[in-house]
């Protein structure tokens, strides 16, 4: 069936140059690699002008020490014990943001209004990778990524067979984690 489209993608961990200015903050003396991401996608042409798509991706945050290592261990009512060796930043197995691996679901629609104009909309959901326990929220003030739902819309305008202009808008819904 030529209306059905399947795809798969993958990106291995990208080893980045260390952040020298943050060597005392990020685990492994400033190392902040980009995690591996894998995914599958399905598209289906519902009509000659309307296509729907579903993507599922999996990001391996736990394999990057500065992102996946455990955050500070503190109990209720305790003050952050920065002086304890177990809570040291910048060390080989130093503190991380404590992020868990994340599965993200994306759903989208594309409508071909004409040979020149395509309209798009989509929804993205990924449970926050930040655990709500044991000091992770406090430590993640440095990297706030708690939005779970995103809505997108966009359009492409083809001015000629070799040139097109694309525009998009994204709205990230508020998400409060405690």
Show which residues each predicted segment covers.
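Outer-membrane beta-barrel porins/channels
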Residues: 1-178
């Amino acid at each position: 069936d030529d209306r059905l489209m399947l795809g798969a993608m993958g990106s291995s961990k990208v080893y980045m140059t260390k952040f020298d200015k943050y060597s005392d903050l990020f685990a492994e003396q400033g190392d902040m690699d980009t995690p591996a991401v894998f995914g599958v996608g399905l598209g289906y042409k519902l009509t000659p002008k309307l296509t729907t798509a579903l993507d599922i991706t999996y990001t391996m945050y736990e394999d990057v020490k500065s992102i996946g290592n455990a955050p500070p261990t503190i109990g209720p009512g305790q003050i952050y014990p920065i002086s304890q060796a177990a809570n040291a930043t910048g060390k080989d197995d130093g503190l991380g943001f404590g992020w868990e691996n994340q599965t993200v679901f994306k759903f989208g629609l594309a409508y071909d209004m004409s040979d020149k104009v395509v309209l798009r909309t989509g929804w993205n959901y990924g449970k926050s990778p930040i655990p709500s326990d044991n000091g992770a929220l406090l430590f993640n003030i440095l990297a706030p990524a708690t939005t779970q739902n995103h809505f997108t819309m966009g359009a492409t305008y083809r001015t000629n067979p070799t040139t097109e202009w694309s525009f998009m808008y994204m709205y990230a819904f508020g998400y409060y984690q405690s």
